[in-house]
């Protein structure tokens, strides 16, 4: 309780426990009198990855996606300097996926998340672009240099195309 959370930038590589641990973090910050809008950091908060590559999920997919979207919506509104989710495809290659499969699953996960957020009645059309901009990615860069380089270039182009074409 002596670490001034409002002056820190905290990265939490947590997924299934993201809602619970972020709540504890916020409670400590509140006890310190910190302004939630000043809190900076990231929660990985990628429960889909837990199903696809690690098997460390706690809840079934639908409730897991609900928790993820709850965190994204809450932090975007209450903690504007917080990065609420980091789609993590890194572990997919570690679990045997090819670079193409890794990229495909990362984009599919992000699309599922954004579709879930957009479907929520409390998220306005005006607020949605801010939520889109809060998603980040953690991708692998394996030993196949040229393949990985091409993957990264394709990823940027595809994500731009998806966000503009699908979400405006």
In which residue ranges do the predicted regions lie?
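Well-ordered alpha-helical scaffold segments within catalytic/enzyme domains
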Residues: 143, 162-163
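Composition- and surface-driven signal marking solvent-exposed, interaction-prone regions
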Residues: 151-152
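Catalytic alpha/beta active-site cores
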Residues: 1-148
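Short, intrinsically disordered, charge-balanced linker/junction segments flanking boundaries
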Residues: 164-168
